[in-house]
Amino acid sequence: MVLIVRILEKNGKKLVNKCYPAFSVSNRKRKFAPFPTLYWLACPETDAMVSNLERQGLIGDLELKINSGQYELERQRFRQQHFRYIHERNRLLYDLSLQHQLDINIEDNCVSWLHNAQRLKGIGGIDVAPLIDANSDEMHLKCLHAHYAHYLGTQDNIIGEWVHELLMRKK
């Protein structure tokens, strides 16, 4: 079971769910597993449009764009966005008042395990270890849905912003 922390809407239409960074794997025992995706597209139409962009090869196109050398400022922003995302996820994970509000009790060893399992996973589950080196050669992308949901939820995701611009042009 995924725990919804907040629902983001526009014009009465559910756009994005903000999720707790762990999900229950058992109803009988308080067992939790990492759920690294904080922002989840909740609108079926938007989800379908982003799926269509992925089928058309946009992930590869955007990887080429961000790695082309022409977008160094965007590249630096993207690196920073991953680390802000990890920080936000960790803050939620350790927020005891939120755990109380959601009526869950995550034991310390479970929090530690979840933190270690997710500490180097950025937006869309991307391994950020190579991003620690500011001169790393190549950035990779996964799941435009995660990037776009993160953009809609925070306005802080360059890949999601590019996806948004493409979707607005297609309307």
Which functions belong to the PLM regions below?
Residues 1-171:
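Preference for intrinsically disordered or flexible, low-complexity segments
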